């Protein structure tokens, strides 16, 4: 005999309640998760006065530089050793930073660009249990930072060579020092279903680099050397989509 309509209505309602009462899929021991998303790097930057080390050592009075923000594609791989403890390897396409002259160098405009490589390994503690749909976390790790494709603008090259080359512009190159730095990380993961999740995190990296600029004339002879220190101290946000396997 067919069930009355009111019985079917109750069955449907109970099914909906049961579906929403199921434990939310989340991360647990042994899980591996790949996240792909957007890194935004906001630099809390500053710089020391540009110093001339040769010839006639001395400061370039009133000089400074600033480093702009950057965006890039981010990739992270996370392995859960327990339901709460995980290690994450953060990678990504190296972001390109733009440097602008400040103070007495402001008239030069953009003075250079560089790509930053900063793979990181972060230990994370996830709060809640493996059935939690929303899981905040804290993390602490380390990153190795180095730079490539360092390019100086023609205006800066002229500024650091022409005064020592009879007013004729030469060429200049720059080396940026590599370093290790700690990574402080907080964030949260929202589990959409058994496999997919959304992630958002903020990391702070206390970071600086020494810049050494070498000027040469047309014959390749070194005619000037300058140096400065740039503080970057970036805050890095990461908005991503994760897949568990």
Predicted regions located by residue number:
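Predominantly the C-terminal beta-signal and adjacent terminal strand-loop region
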Residues: 96, 193-245
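Short loop/turn motifs that connect adjacent beta-strands in outer-membrane beta-barrel proteins
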Residues: 25-31, 84, 128-135, 192-195
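Transmembrane beta-barrel strand/turn architecture of Gram-negative outer membrane proteins
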Residues: 120-122, 183-190
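Gram-negative (and chloroplast) outer-membrane scaffold detector with strong preference
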Residues: 40-42, 76-157, 232-245
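Cleavable N-terminal export/targeting peptides
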Residues: 1-30
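Solvent-exposed loop segments that connect transmembrane elements
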Residues: 47-63, 99-108, 150-173, 210-229
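Short glycine/proline- and aromatic-enriched beta-strand/turn motifs that initiate or cap beta-hairpins
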Residues: 26-76, 236, 242-244
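Short sequence motifs at beta-strands and strand-loop junctions characteristic
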Residues: 65-71, 113-118, 174-181, 229-233
């Amino acid at each position: 005999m067919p069930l009355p309509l009111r019985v079917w209505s109750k069955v449907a309602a109970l099914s909906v309640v049961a579906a929403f009462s199921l434990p939310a899929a989340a991360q647990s021991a042994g899980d591996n998760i790949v996240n792909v998303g957007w890194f935004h790097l906001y630099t809390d930057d500053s710089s020391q006065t540009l110093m001339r080390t040769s010839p006639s050592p001395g400061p370039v009075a009133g000089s400074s530089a600033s480093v702009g923000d950057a965006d890039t594609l981010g990739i992270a791989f996370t392995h859960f050793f327990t339901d709460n403890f995980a290690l994450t390897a953060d990678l990504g396409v190296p972001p390109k930073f733009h440097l602008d002259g400040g103070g007495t160098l402001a008239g030069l405009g953009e003075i250079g660009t560089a790509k930053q490589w900063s793979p990181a390994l972060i230990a994370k503690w996830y709060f809640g249990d493996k059935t939690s749909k929303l899981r905040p976390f804290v993390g602490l790790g380390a990153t190795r930072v180095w730079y490539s494709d360092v390019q100086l603008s023609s205006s800066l090259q002229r500024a650091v060579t022409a005064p020592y080359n009879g007013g004729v512009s030469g060429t200049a190159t720059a080396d940026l020092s590599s370093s290790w730095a700690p990574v402080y990380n907080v964030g949260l993961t929202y589990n959409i279903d058994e496999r997919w999740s959304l992630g958002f995190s903020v990391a702070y990296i206390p970071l600086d680099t020494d810049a050494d600029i070498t000027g040469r004339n047309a014959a390749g002879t070194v005619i000037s050397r300058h140096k400065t220190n740039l503080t970057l101290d970036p805050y890095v946000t990461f908005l991503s989509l994760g897949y568990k396997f």
